[in-house]
Every structure is written in C-alpha cells, then in structure tokens.
Amino acid sequence: MNNLKEAIKQAEHIVFLTGAGVSVPSGIPDYRSKNGLYAGMSSPEYMLSHTCLVREPEKFYQFVTENMYYPDAVPNTIHRKMAEIEADKNVTVITQNIDGLHEKAGSKKVVNFHGSLYHCYCQKCGRSVSASDYLQSDIHADCGGVVRPDVVLYEEAISESAIDQSLAAIREADLIVIVGTSFRVSPFCNLTDYRNKKARIFAVNKERISLPYPFEMIENDAVKVFAEI
C-alpha cells in the first residue's frame, strides 16, 4: 500500500481502471459472484442483450428497471478518494461500471466504457430522455418511440468515442491502477497493451489478477487500501 501511495504522489498522469468491485461497497451487486446479479438466473446475458431489447422490449425494460438501477446508492471511499486525487493530479477514470458513482463523487474526467444507466435516449427520434422519466416508462412521451439506456448490451460494440478517449489517457499515463475487477473482459482488459512502457501498473483486488507484463499486486479490500492512501 505504501508503494501505491508513493507512486500516486510521484505520478503526473494517472489512469484508474475500475470494475464492479468498486461499487459493491455502495450496495450495488457485481455480476458473477455467488451473491451477484446473475446468481440463480438461467439466462441473464439474454436479458441484457440487444436481441432481447429488440424482440422483447417489455421484458428487457422490466429486467433493467428492477435489477440494474440503484438511484439511492452513494459513492464510497474508493470513488471519493479518486475524485480527491484529481484535485492535484491529471486523473482519468475509465470504468466498466454503469452506475454513475464516479461522477457523483466529483470525478470530472470519467470514461464510461460500457455507457451509463443515467444517460437514456429514444431509439425512434434520438432525443435524450432523463433516467427518472425512463424509470416511469420506456415509451417516449413525445414520439411514442422506445427509450433505452445508453449502455453497451451483449451483441453491441463499445463506442469509438470511449475507445479513443481511453487509449489517449492510457498512452499518456505514467501510473495505471486497476481496481475492483478481474480484468478478463475484452476489450477493457486490452487497454493496458497500449500503455507507455515506462508506466507503472498496480492492481488492487480481493483476488489476484493475471497480466502478461510486470505489475504490483495488492491483494486486499480496495476500500481499506484507498482509505489509507
């Protein structure tokens, strides 16, 4: 932990790569753990697929609104500390999470790699729709089109904008910190392939992750680690 604290002090350009484990302490379940969102479900990937959205929009809407939204969740120590570090450093947060908690914590440079539940739009007219309106109905009041959250579903591609912003930040970073993710989902896990080779890499996760190049592993609860930074 002391090594990470010192690395953050010395770094000028920091990238945090965050996953579901960052939001679990805020009461938002991860996906695949024994207590995760998918536990006991027979076809959760289908429910969050483009096919389901197109073929069974009512079923998609019910699943998303009943299982994905946690509007009362608040940022935890990890989110807050990352935002705090941004006050003194050039920090970019690239997150797999779609819950908006990094922004709630005050982080300004956030790349929502898989989109955000709190950005919604009508598929018919393209206009933005508030998340609060979407939670009331998935039918756009203005044109009758079907509204969806701007998140990356199964069978959909990551946006070019998210990839471009991520690669620009990764290439500039002299410190990369992977937090709360097994770092196995592509293309998110491939981002570090484009790093500056002089950049230091740390990983903070309860379970050890594997990378094909040198990095420093902190196998611990990220809340405890960030509380001491």
Swiss-Prot record:
InterPro entries in the record: DHS-like_NAD/FAD-binding_dom, NAD-dep_sirtuin_deacylases, Sirtuin, Sirtuin_cat_small_dom_sf, Sirtuin_class_U, Ssirtuin_cat_dom
UniProt: NAD(+) binding residues: A20, R32, Q96, I98, D99, H114, T181, S182, N205, V223
Family recorded in the similarity comment: Belongs to the sirtuin family. Class U subfamily.
This protein's record includes keyword Cytoplasm: yes
PANTHER family for the chain: NAD-DEPENDENT PROTEIN DEACYLASE (PTHR11085:SF4), NAD-DEPENDENT PROTEIN DEACYLASE SIRTUIN-5, MITOCHONDRIAL-RELATED (PTHR11085)
EC number: 2.3.1.286
Gene Ontology CC entries for this record: cytoplasm
Free-text function comment from the UniProt entry: NAD-dependent protein deacetylase which modulates the activities of several enzymes which are inactive in their acetylated form.
Organism: Listeria innocua serovar 6a (strain ATCC BAA-680 / CLIP 11262)
Subcellular location: Cytoplasm
Active-site residues, Swiss-Prot/TrEMBL: H114 (proton acceptor)
Ranges of residues in domain Deacetylase sirtuin-type: 1-229
GO molecular function terms listed in the Swiss-Prot or TrEMBL record: histone deacetylase activity, NAD-dependent; NAD+ binding
Keyword Cytoplasm assigned: yes
Domain of life: Bacteria
Residues noted as binding nicotinamide in the record, renumbered to the chain: I98, D99
Protein name: NAD-dependent protein deacetylase
UniProt catalytic activity: N(6)-acetyl-L-lysyl-[protein] + NAD(+) + H2O = 2''-O-acetyl-ADP-D-ribose + nicotinamide + L-lysyl-[protein]
Species classification: Bacteria, Bacillati, Bacillota, Bacilli, Bacillales
Keywords assigned by UniProt, alphabetized: Cytoplasm, NAD, Transferase
